[in-house]
Amino acid sequence: MATLEEKLCPVCFQEAMEGGKCQNCGYVLDKASVGKNYLRSFSILNTKYLLGKSLGQGGFGITYLAKNMLNGSRCCIKEYFPSNLIQSRMPDGTVALTGEENRCEFEDGKQRFIEEARTLQELRGNVAVVDIQDFFEENGTAYFAMELIEGCNLRAFKKEHNEEQTFKMALQMLLLIGSALAEVHRFGMIHGDISPENILITQNG
């Protein structure tokens, strides 16, 4: 008999996995979403976030799909995980640094990560800025929970639409993004990573 973990889908969080495929949302088990440094699916963070599949890893962090067990909503969890400073992850989820000589740099970066989450939380309601719902420390590092954006990024949009449609969408978005960046800069923050991959378009535009 399958265990609850084997039946639970890491995307829709329904007990609908059969033979590696979710009978509810259609998700097919993807081994590429289980990296050696990723937290295990269905780990629990901050006593209320049930982790699902990993959505990707950048130079400074790993993003996971998650479910808020208090209200049942899905969200994204961003983990502070600078790959140049972290050597590995321990079995209990704690991060292990490449060396104690990097401790100060890691802690400084972690505090900036938390401060940025706190600042972005103050911008909730701005349609061009993702809502930050929570932030906390655990496993020797830091995390923040943000709203799940259902849609695609600008690069994916470009592949599926003609140049005129892409240009109109990009122009509309640049006006919103410019306004949002002005607010972010007012708080003394610099994004530093504006790219088509990081510009998200919701399903309703």
Predicted regions and their residues:
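Conserved short submotifs of the Hanks-type protein kinase catalytic core
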Residues: 139-153
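AlphaC helix of the eukaryotic protein kinase fold
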Residues: 91-122
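Activation-segment/catalytic-loop signature of the eukaryotic protein kinase fold
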Residues: 135
